[in-house]
């Protein structure tokens, strides 16, 4: 189902949601951190989704053990490097990794700006080693409130040339986008792209707000757009992309089952929607699974899957020249 003549991308992938269970175990031992289990087999149920979670917030707790072992900046550097290694192993040519430095720093009171620098270093080294192209998206974790998001924003701005876009993630229902207008004004002033998690837990109004008030060029998840025909028309007309994450939306109970996922309808409506993983380490899936298992189960035809793959590159926060070069590089192989 993957067209090997086209670039394979993953543009909605959380770096801090892709910490290997084996790495959690090793870092726990290295830093003498008490874990809920001492073997890989018994740890996995604590750090991966085994059964669908009742809601988004419950799903997000599965990420916590991964960041609890980030006891040093070296540990942050390691998981960033391993994220690129994982991307290469699964055949990705281009990946946009998003991360919340405040969340990564929290358990051990690491310097937030230091976490940003460590992630940049690890990703850069990974790209050099494995030949994957990557860009970084800074996440503000809305769950921790406006002041914490301000701290994350300042840390990103200290490395503004290494950050491609700003995102807002976390508890969408409890912390609406309207709380973060000034943060996104500064992000746009910095020349960054904007993508926002919206319409995953909250309704279509959250997506409208992300676009109109925060300046979103892409929407993370966006499943609730299916409830608003005018919104779907607007997304298609304005070419505002939807970063679909099929398996994730089932695991968070945002969508009841793959057969009911709106991605097929979005594509039929002319919306620029792509296939992505979200938190592959926590989900126990990879991009190959999303294309070859999840997408067909969601009712996508072979041609629709190919279109979603094309959309992944079209939606990417790359220049037209960078996209052309990547297409040519893959086609020449």
UniProtKB/Swiss-Prot annotation:
Documented EC number(s): 3.5.4.4
Catalysed reactions, as listed in the record: adenosine + H2O + H(+) = inosine + NH4(+); 2'-deoxyadenosine + H2O + H(+) = 2'-deoxyinosine + NH4(+)
Pfam families: A_deaminase (PF00962)
Signal peptide stretch: none
Residues forming the catalytic site: 200 (proton donor)
Listed Gene3D superfamilies: Metal-dependent hydrolases
GO CC entries: cytosol
Molecular function via GO: 2'-deoxyadenosine deaminase activity; adenosine deaminase activity; zinc ion binding
Residues that, per the record, bind substrate: 14, 16, 170, 279
Site description Important for catalytic activity, residues in chain: 221
Designated name of the protein: Adenosine deaminase
GO biological process: adenosine catabolic process; hypoxanthine salvage; inosine biosynthetic process; nucleotide metabolic process; purine ribonucleoside monophosphate biosynthetic process
